Amino acid sequence: MPRESLHRQNIIACIWDFDKTLIPGYMQAPIFRAYNIDEESFWREVNALPEIYGERGTRVSHDTVYLNHLISHVKNGDLKGLTNQRLRELGGELEFYPGIAELFDRLRELPESQPQYRKHNIRLEHYIVSTGLAEMIRGSAIAPHVDDIFACEFIEAP
């Protein structure tokens, strides 16, 4: 195969999880504080849901079943006024491990600062892939340091 027909990539993608990777806990904590929902009870209920649904013949993902529980709280009025704008605001309350934003920036600059990488136009990009809420991540301090966010969307008017 001729050299010029080979498809060459020059982008290094760093894929980051969010909860307990970039932040010490779960991103939903600011929601629980804002709406006076007991966080421990919420997660205990969520952890019981796969078995409850399983008894009904429905298999659910342990990672995303919490979203159904959040929707139940919205429908029951416990999360009255929860919107994407509010999620973005609450995302601003998320506290990251110390130095995360600086680490993202330093990693991005590394290939640009090395001649052997610069000559090939090697770039480093940051992406967040999470089962968390995208709007909260977009409202957080890390958002300006990432290239894209792939997470769960809160649909206000389905």
Which residues does each predicted region cover?
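Alpha-helical substrate-recognition element adjacent to the catalytic core
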Residues: 1-157
